[in-house]
């Protein structure tokens, strides 16, 4: 009989979530570096460079890979011979471990979980509760998988109830472009096929916990070995999704996915459920077993596991944002790399909602946005002598509904975020001769190092969603939508899809 002690289990959960906050899995590092080596689009290669450099910096400094340190997801396989030496339930122990991990002062993680999601949406302050999936299996061990999944990729999850005769590849290739770049490619696609709707979604999520092995599968196919249905489907989807030319951060390029994972399950004769969930550039998961001998001891990657890369945007144009004018903004073209210097404002979902409500009521805003740039970000709290914790961009499309009003009524000159903007937002940018700049998702620590001072200007009660003023030095961004409304996320993938030449570009 295996006895698992309460404190050993709690501490193992805590250590696991701290561990994955700053260590990429080695298989992800290896796969991304191989993609970097073959990438031909300079913009996409630049983005991957930032992600790889950021990854190594986070590992060396034990700070989060991404400012969105995710919602905690835990898969448990509990052996039937396991006995618990505990006063708390398994769910309570998991949540205590998550609480410790996210509130540890040595590496504070961002609390992103909100209670009462349909109502007040109040932050729980410690990132609990976790999402827990538990099964009872034979044996005397507890198998644990801990994953932290950010909102940018989770929000791009898809579920469809296909007809039995529908083609899975066609559905995936039709769906991927609708997901935009908010899931921070290059990453991994997890697909669940069969069962019931909720089973398909769970399989899609669980598939993402397995190691990247697409190259081994390619070698198996090349050897002439027989492939299973799911293996053949993985290879076909891997080739064709990358042939869409979406590329790193949606900038166009050769690699959009590093692997495609598939789990399936028997389903009803009338049904063909399919779910798809992407894993982002901040891929974070770890697996371990507890056998009663004590808490887990996780082995960190070696520094040598990371490629010896440096990030230096020598082609960037330095911009003094304190003296920014519409005339200067009008001179920028999509794809231009800029290095921002001066003071920028921040604000995301909750702040924008408040600001627009104030505008609707004719109230004076707490901040003057005239000729300013606003950065869509919710930073991690600083530790030690940091000015701010990791502070990468959040998905800009969530602010689309506010953009025209903000540009028209506040004098705002530009925005900084990640991913594409919708067609109506691009029109609003053109109508107001504004600009949208893109920072790299998955490079939060790199961005934080460019922030030299930080102070809250408005809505401090919103925590990470408050309006800050950051003073930045050489903060790297790319012009994603210029003052004419042209979007790099609309033009670049089509260009690279045509260049790859596997899937015809629709006119």
Regions found by a protein language model. Give the residues of each.
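Non-transmembrane, aqueous-exposed alpha-helical and coiled segments at domain scale
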Residues: 1-312, 406-408
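Short, solvent-exposed amphipathic alpha-helical segments in soluble enzyme
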Residues: 162, 204-208, 275-279, 292-294, ...
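Feature captures the catalytic cores and cofactor-binding loops of soluble hydro-lyases/lyases
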Residues: 208, 212-252, 346-475
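C-terminal binding/interaction regions
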Residues: 252-260, 267-268, 281, 303, ...
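Short, structured beta-strand/loop micro-motifs enriched in basic residues and often containing a Trp
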Residues: 314-324
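Residue "hotspots" at secondary-structure boundaries inside conserved domains
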Residues: 327-330, 367
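Short, well-ordered loop/turn sites that connect or cap secondary structure elements
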Residues: 329-332, 338
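Short, charged beta-turn/beta-strand-edge "cap" motif at the junction between a beta-strand
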Residues: 337, 343-347, 483
């Amino acid at each position: 009989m295996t006895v698992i002690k309460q404190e050993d289990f709690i501490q193992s959960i805590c250590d696991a979530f701290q561990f994955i906050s700053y260590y990429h899995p080695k298989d992800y590092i290896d796969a991304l570096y191989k993609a970097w080596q073959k990438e031909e689009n300079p913009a996409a290669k630049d983005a991957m460079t930032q992600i790889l450099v950021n990854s190594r910096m986070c590992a060396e400094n034990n700070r989060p890979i991404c400012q969105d340190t995710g919602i905690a997801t835990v898969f448990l396989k509990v052996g039937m011979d396991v006995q618990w030496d505990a006063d708390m339930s398994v769910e309570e122990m998991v949540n205590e471990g998550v609480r410790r991990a996210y509130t540890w002062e040595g590496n504070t993680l961002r609390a992103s979980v909100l209670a009462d999601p349909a109502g007040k949406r109040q932050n729980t302050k410690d990132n609990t509760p976790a999402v827990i999936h538990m099964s009872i299996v034979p044996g005397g061990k507890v198998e644990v998988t801990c994953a932290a999944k950010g909102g940018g990729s989770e929000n791009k999850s898809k579920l469809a109830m296909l007809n039995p005769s529908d083609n899975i590849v066609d559905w995936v290739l039709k769906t991927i472009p609708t997901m935009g770049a908010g899931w921070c490619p290059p990453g991994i696609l997890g697909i669940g096929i069969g069962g019931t709707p909720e089973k398909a979604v769970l399989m899609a999520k669980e598939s993402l916990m397995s190691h990247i092995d697409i190259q081994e599968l390619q070698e198996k196919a090349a050897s002439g070995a027989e492939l299973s249905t799911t293996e053949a489907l993985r290879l076909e989807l891997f080739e064709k999704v990358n042939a869409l030319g979406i590329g790193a951060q949606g900038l166009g390029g050769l690699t959009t996915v590093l692997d495609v994972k598939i789990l399936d399950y028997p389903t009803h004769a009338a049904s063909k459920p399919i779910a798809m969930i992407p894993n982002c550039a901040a891929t974070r998961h770890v697996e371990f077993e507890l056998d009663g001998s004590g808490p887990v001891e996780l082995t960190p990657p070696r520094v040598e596991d990371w490629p010896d890369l440096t990030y230096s945007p020598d082609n960037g144009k330095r911009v003094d944002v304190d003296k920014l004018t519409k005339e200067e903004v009008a001179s920028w073209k999509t794809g231009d790399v800029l290095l921002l210097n001066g003071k920028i404002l921040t604000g995301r979902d909750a702040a924008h909602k408040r600001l627009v409500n104030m505008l609707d009521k004719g109230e004076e805003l707490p901040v003057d946005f005239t000729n300013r740039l606003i950065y869509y970000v919710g930073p991690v709290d600083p530790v030690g002598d940091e000015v701010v914790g990791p502070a990468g961009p959040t998905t800009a499309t969530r602010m689309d509904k506010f953009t025209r009003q903000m540009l028209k009524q506040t004098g705002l000159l530009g925005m900084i975020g990640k991913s594409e903007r919708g067609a109506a937002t691009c029109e609003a940018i053109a109508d107001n001769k504004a600009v949208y700049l893109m920072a790299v998702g998955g490079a939060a620590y790199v961005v934080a190092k460019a922030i030299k001072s930080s102070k809250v200007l408005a809505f401090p009660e919103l925590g990470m969603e408050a309006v800050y003023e950051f003073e930045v030095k050489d903060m790297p961004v790319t012009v994603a939508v210029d003052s004419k409304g042209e979007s790099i996320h609309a033009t670049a993938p089509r260009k690279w899809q045509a260049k790859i030449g596997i899937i015809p570009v629709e006119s």
